[in-house]
C-alpha cells in the first residue's frame, strides 16, 4: 500500500492524480492510502521514524527531478515533482498527465525505468548529452540489486519517450529505438507493468487493527483470483497472525478523497 498525499495542486492536476490512482487500483494489486491528514512521523521505542509518504507537488525549480528520483518505498518522504508545463489543459490531456503520474507511482512502488535495464543497449540508443542534467538518474543502467522480468518492454509506462527529459523537447531526442526509430509516449500500464506490480503487492484494505483484509479483486500470476481463492488467501494470511474468521467491518479505515 502506498501512502499518498499531495501539496497544493490545481483541479486539473488533482483530477489527473485521482485518475492515475483509479487506473492503477483497477488493474493491479497496488492500493493507495490518503495520508494527507496523518502525522509525518511515528515514534517507536523512543526512535522517531519519518513515514514513507509519496507526495505530489508542483515543480518550483529546475533542480527538482521530473517525476520521482526514488525507486521503491525506501523510507522518508518521496516527492513526485510535476512540471509546471503539464498544468495546461490546452496542451495536455488529463490522461497524459495521469500517465506521467502513474509512471512516477510505479517508480515509488519499486519499478525502475525500462531504459535502466542492464540489457537496454540491445534495444535502445541513449543520447546522454541531450538529457537534462538533473534527469540523468532516470537513465542510469542498473547492474545489481535489480529484478528483471521478461523481455525489454517497449510498451512499459516507465519507458521514456524519445523527447522525454530533453534539454530541448521540441527537437532533440534523448532516446530512440535501436536503429533510430522514435519511441512514443505510453499512456497505459503494459501487461508486464501489471505483472511486476502484482507479483510484489497484495490489495490490502487499510485497517486500524491487526486483521488483514484483501480488496475484492486480487491478481496472481497474471490472473484474477476467484472469490473463494481470495478468501482462502485472506484466511491463510490472518491465520499466520492467529486470527480466524472474517475481518470485522468496524476496523476499516475509510479512505478520504484527496483535495
Q: What does each of the following model-derived ranges do?
A:
Residues 1-259:
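Zinc-dependent metalloendopeptidases
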Amino acid at each position: 500500500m502506498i501512502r499518498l498525499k499531495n501539496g497544493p495542486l490545481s483541479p486539473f492536476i488533482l483530477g489527473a492524480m485521482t485518475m492515475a490512482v483509479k487506473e492503477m487500483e483497477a488493474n493491479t494489486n497496488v492500493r493507495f492510502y490518503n495520508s494527507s491528514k496523518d502525522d509525518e512521523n511515528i515514534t517507536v521505542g523512543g526512535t522517531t521514524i519519518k513515514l514513507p509518504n509519496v507526495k505530489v507537488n508542483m515543480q518550483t525549480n529546475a533542480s527538482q527531478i521530473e517525476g520521482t528520483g526514488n525507486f521503491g518505498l525506501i523510507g522518508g518522504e518521496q516527492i513526485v515533482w510535476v512540471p509546471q508545463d503539464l498544468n495546461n489543459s490546452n496542451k495536455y490531456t488529463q490522461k497524459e498527465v495521469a500517465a506521467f503520474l502513474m509512471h512516477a507511482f510505479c517508480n515509488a512502488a519499486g519499478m525502475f525505468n525500462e531504459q535502466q535495464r542492464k540489457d537496454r543497449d540491445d534495444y535502445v540508443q541513449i543520447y546522454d548529452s541531450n538529457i537534462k542534467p538533473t534527469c540523468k538518474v532516470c537513465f542510469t543502467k542498473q547492474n545489481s540489486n535489480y529484478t528483471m522480468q521478461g523481455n525489454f518492454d517497449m510498451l512499459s509506462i516507465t519507458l521514456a519517450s524519445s523527447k522525454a527529459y530533453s534539454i530541448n523537447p521540441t527537437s532533440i531526442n534523448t532516446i530512440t529505438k535501436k536503429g533510430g526509430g522514435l519511441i512514443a509516449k505510453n499512456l497505459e500500464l503494459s501487461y508486464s507493468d501489471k505483472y511486476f506490480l502484482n507479483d510484489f503487492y497484495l490489495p490490502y484494505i487499510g485497517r486500524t487493527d491487526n486483521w488483514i483484509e484483501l480488496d475484492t479483486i486480487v491478481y496472481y500470476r497474471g490472473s484474477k483470483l476467484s472469490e473463494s481463492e481470495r478468501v482462502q488467501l485472506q484466511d491463510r494470511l490472518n491465520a499466520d497472525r492467529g486470527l480466524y474468521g472474517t475481518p470485522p467491518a468496524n476496523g476499516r479505515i475509510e479512505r478520504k478523497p484527496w483535495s
